[in-house]
């Protein structure tokens, strides 16, 4: 029931399936591992939905004139995270089909709130209602299968998307960590 209510609210009758999206972001990004350390950023992102994928290019301002360029992507089943000071000095370079791919596919799946036709069962998402306001969505892309918990507001729209465990980079390694995205101010 909550997913049907969401789809009826978010989509129009006869709406075509979204195949691709371009998004510009600006805001602040928490760079802290143990304490909050919010830094301004701007980015451009391209998303494809026919086979889950995205390519996010960002600049995070660490200090005036000192930017970190971040490339975060999920392409053809591979996760990519590369960050470089001034775009020249590599700080992080992770790629592959294991936990990196899993984390990046989670990001794609959670952000599908912005292109909701990607959440239709016809697009490969399996849904299981948990209660009147939440459901578990499961997505498979190639060898990666994952599930996220979606909660919906009184208006029927997505409020949160959470994973019990998503890899987080700490000291050069990946640490499983609970992870949530929050959505509000739909326009």
List each model region and its residues.
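N-terminal mature ectodomain segment of secretory-pathway/periplasmic proteins
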Residues: 4-89
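Gly/Pro-enriched, hydrophobic low-complexity segments
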Residues: 136-186
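Buried hydrophobic residues that stabilize the cores of well-folded domains
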Residues: 40-46, 73-77, 81-83, 102, ...
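A short, polar/proline- and glycine-enriched secondary-structure boundary/capping micro-motif
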Residues: 65-71, 90-95, 147-149, 170-174
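Flexible, processing/modification-adjacent segments and terminal tails
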Residues: 82-141, 171
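Short, solvent-exposed secondary-structure boundary motifs
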Residues: 29-41, 56-65, 110-122, 137-143, ...
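A structural detector for beta-sheet-dominated domains
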Residues: 24-26, 32, 84, 128, ...
């Amino acid at each position: 029931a909550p997913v049907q209510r969401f789809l009826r609210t978010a989509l129009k009758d006869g709406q075509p399936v979204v195949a691709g999206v371009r998004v510009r972001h600006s805001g602040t990004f928490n760079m802290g591992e143990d304490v909050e350390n919010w830094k301004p950023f701007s980015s451009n992102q391209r998303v494809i939905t026919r086979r889950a994928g995205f390519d996010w290019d960002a600049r995070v301002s660490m200090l005036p004139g000192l930017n970190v360029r971040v490339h975060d992507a999920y392409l053809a089943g591979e996760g990519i995270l590369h960050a470089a000071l001034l775009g020249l000095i590599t700080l992080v370079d992770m790629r592959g089909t294991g936990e990196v791919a899993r984390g990046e596919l989670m990001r794609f799946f959670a952000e599908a709130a912005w292109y909701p036709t990607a959440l239709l069962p016809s697009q490969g998402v399996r849904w299981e209602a948990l209660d009147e306001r939440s459901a578990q969505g499961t997505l498979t892309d190639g060898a990666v299968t994952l599930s996220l918990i979606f909660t919906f507001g009184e208006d029927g729209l997505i409020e949160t998307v959470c994973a019990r465990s998503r890899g987080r980079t700490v000291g050069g390694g990946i640490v499983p960590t609970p992870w949530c995205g929050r959505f509000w101010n739909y326009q």
